[in-house]
Amino acid sequence: MATEYTLSDLCAAFEVSRSGYYAWASRPPGPRAQANARLAKQIQEVYDEHHQNYGSPRVTNQLRQQGHRCTRKRVERLMRQQGLRGRQQKRFKVITTDSQHDQPIAPNRLKDIRITAPSQVWVADITYVPTAEGWLYVAGVMDLFSRKLIGWAMEGHLESRLTLNALQMAIQQRRPGAGLIHHSDRGVQYASADFRQRLQDHGLEASMSRKACCYDNATMESFWSSLKNELVHRCAYETRAQARQSIFEWIEAYYNRVRLHSSLDYKSPVDFENQLN
């Protein structure tokens, strides 16, 4: 049976007076405690601003960019005390593309390539998003230098114009020079005559992953994983139009302009490209 002690009993046991205890209990927090309280509030603001997705590394770097002096260890401790945890990225599922078609397959041109500027290599892929109306298929084109998504299209089908529209958006945004490498999987949408002709018309070189090896396009797979973990899995879309609007806003207003990337020295894709100017 647990024994209950009065305050007088505890004060006597520790040889302190009741008045001394009350003086200690009522004194204001010290400078360190006050600083931690301020930082904890700022951590909460960053955490909420980024939809409770950021863990301590991104929160720390976001705070530093805002002018706050803090270490990752301190931020991690305060986040733990507040019960704040970043959303864990699930490993992407290995879903290989059906390459059973009679279209030409381009070689993998990414081996040993060194990327030093925008519009050297673009990577492209397709994913799908569930809605109450059925699947919404999303095609994306990313600049491998900055991880910026520069082209996308969303349709309720997997016809070739899905990938063509995403490619055309990227071309209009970037106006690339001849020789740029466009890398994708071996799917028929990327191997089709229309797609190959569009690449040729703009002087772009096709590159494709090895057979049944989605890891050759891991950067795009990682992007889809972020999109689904940070947005799609939190939503229940009634219509494809609702999903389109939500995904558009996440890409254009958040992912490209705000979201920090560890591979970009904790900068957003737009900020990473702007530092070149």
Model-derived features with residue positions:
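Charged DNA-binding/catalytic regions of mobile-element recombinases
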Residues: 1-277
